[in-house]
Design a protein with these regions (language model features):
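Two-component histidine phosphotransfer core
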Residues: 1-131, 136-140
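C-terminal coupling/interaction segments
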Residues: 143-145
Length: 145
């Protein structure tokens, strides 16, 4: 997917969602069956024919696994994607554990890159809201279609 299908300026949302599901399945392989984290991904609306920038949603799911699930499989991730003819809504909510990166290196780089990419690709036709507390982290992304 990353090498061949996502090389253009846009990709069918159905393929992007399929890639997200594959990524989630891959991440869950590292946990034993008795310590699987709670991961809930629901996609509603019409996915086929809806074009988005490739890999624009993946960094949020990557961050949810990185910061929302500890090594024992404790934590949760809730992902919702909904499309209408006018808008894509993408919501990720996850538990939050203390920063694993004690040195502070690379902190927030991925998120800053996504912000820049959204600004470049969607200008003022998107909104990204981030809500962070001690125990939970949420992003609410809306992109005009």
């Amino acid at each position: 997917y990353m090498l061949y299908e996502s090389t253009g300026e846009s990709i069918d949302l159905k393929l992007e969602v399929e890639h997200l599901r594959n990524y989630i399945d891959l991440m869950l392989l590292k946990y034993k069956s008795d310590e699987l984290p709670e991961v809930d991904f629901q996609a509603d609306g019409t996915l086929e024919g809806c074009l988005v920038a490739p890999l624009i949603l993946l960094p949020f799911v990557e961050n949810a696994f990185k910061h929302g699930i500890n090594n024992n499989g404790e934590g949760f991730i809730k992902i919702r994607l909904d499309t209408s003819s006018e808008e894509l809504k993408f919501y990720v909510n996850n538990s939050r554990f203390q920063d694993r990166n004690a040195s502070g290196e690379h902190k927030g780089i991925g998120l800053e890159n996504v912000r820049r990419r959204l600004k470049h690709l969607y200008s003022d036709n998107h909104n990204l809201e981030i809500i962070s507390s001690d125990n939970e982290y949420s992003i609410d992304l809306r992109i005009g279609l």
